[in-house]
């Protein structure tokens, strides 16, 4: 998978490397993402920009930590032939202020939280969801936990009772 990364309104950091590591770990747990023809863009931006995107595309008038915009449905992704032109999997946008606040509240690094949200976003682009049923949510969370474990990042859901 080819990654296009744009960084706006985030502090200096190893965001390209973090994104690449998150993508590799996610490909390891979701083989459909291992396709060489896939392209994904990841935007590190502000709460203000994510608020605009959330309002325009999801009709939710507030910022959120991560948004994903899939461009291939799950069946088409799984049927993708090895040869052919690049295919845009979708876009991911992360909101700095929300991500930083959540990381502080959880007592984890911004890098670890951003990694989790990139994994989460990539799984959404691959057709996974957590809204329709508890079973779907559990499946998606298990993939997130497995991908993050490959990177040495603790289970982000481990504090639930």
UniProtKB/Swiss-Prot annotation:
Its EC number is 3.1.-.-. One of its GO terms (cellular component) is cytoplasm. It is an enzyme of class 3 (hydrolase). The keyword Nucleotidyltransferase does not apply. Zn(2+) binds at residues 120, 124, 130. Single strand-specific metallo-endoribonuclease involved in late-stage 70S ribosome quality control and in maturation of the 3' terminus of the 16S rRNA. Belongs to the endoribonuclease YbeY family. This is Endoribonuclease YbeY. It comes from Erythrobacter litoralis (strain HTCC2594). The gene is ybeY.
């Amino acid at each position: 998978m080819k990654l296009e990364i744009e960084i706006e309104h985030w502090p200096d950091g190893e965001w390209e490397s973090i994104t690449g590591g998150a993508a590799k770990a996610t490909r390891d747990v979701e083989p459909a993402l291992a396709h060489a023809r896939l392209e994904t863009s990841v935007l590190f931006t502000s709460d203000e920009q994510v608020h605009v995107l959330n309002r325009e595309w999801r009709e939710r008038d507030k910022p959120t930590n991560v948004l994903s915009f899939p461009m291939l449905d799950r069946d088409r992704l799984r049927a993708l032939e090895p040869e052919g032109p690049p295919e845009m999997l979708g876009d991911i946008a992360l909101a700095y202020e929300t991500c930083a606040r959540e990381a502080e509240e959880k007592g984890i690094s911004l890098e670890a939280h951003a990694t989790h949200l990139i994994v989460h976003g990539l799984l959404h682009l691959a057709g996974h969801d957590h809204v329709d049923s508890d079973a779907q949510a559990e499946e998606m969370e298990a993939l997130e936990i497995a991908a993050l474990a490959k990177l040495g990042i603790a289970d982000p859901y481990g504090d639930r009772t």
